[in-house]
Design a protein with these regions (language model features):
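Surface-exposed, charged secondary-structure patches
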Residues: 71-118
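The N-terminal extracellular segments of secreted preproproteins, especially immediately downstream
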Residues: 18-19, 95, 121
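Extracytoplasmic/secreted envelope proteins and their assembly/folding machinery
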Residues: 34-41, 49, 53, 71-74, ...
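Short, low-complexity N-terminal intrinsically disordered segments enriched in polar/charged residues
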Residues: 19-46
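Short beta-strand edge/turn micro-motifs at domain boundaries
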Residues: 118-135
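Sec-dependent bacterial lipoprotein signal peptides
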Residues: 1-20
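Short, well-ordered alpha-helical segments enriched in acidic and aromatic residues
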Residues: 46-63
Length: 135
């Protein structure tokens, strides 16, 4: 039978391993959620409005006419960005913070406009069945 000291050492080693493994997992989750948000916004700036809308949470269950309105709103948004900033030159992921217990994340994207202005936007994300979607 193990003594108390041996059991404590084994427990500490197991907990240390669990903590280290968890940090790697959270980094991978944050990277995946953030890169997914970046990909959805890349669809937006490339004019692929249907793909952008498809990246929204539960987009597969909305009525077709509402989906068309959302795609039209995305197109209007891009027109406004073209009018205000001569368009968007790039979207890049700055950082992402995930809440693994709630299967949510916040992706911070840097939008670089063609008029040299930039801004950071927060894209709330939710994970469903292993896939990340915009809230």
């Amino acid at each position: 039978m193990m003594n108390h000291k041996t059991l404590t050492i084994i427990l500490a080693a197991v907990l240390s391993l669990a903590c280290c493994t968890g940090s790697n997992d959270i980094e991978a989750i944050q990277e995946r959620a953030g890169k997914t948000a970046e990909a959805y916004y890349t669809h937006l700036i490339n004019g692929n409005y249907a793909d952008f809308v498809a990246g929204m949470d539960r987009a597969d269950s909305i009525p077709a006419d509402y989906r068309e309105q959302m795609e039209a709103n995305a197109a209007m948004f891009m027109k406004q960005q073209n009018d205000d900033h001569k368009g968007i030159s790039s979207i890049t992921l700055s950082k992402c913070k995930a809440d693994t217990a709630n299967h949510t994340a916040e992706a911070f994207l840097v939008i670089e406009y063609k008029d040299k202005v930039s801004e950071v936007v927060c894209v709330p994300m939710v994970e469903r069945a292993g896939n990340w979607y915009m809230k």
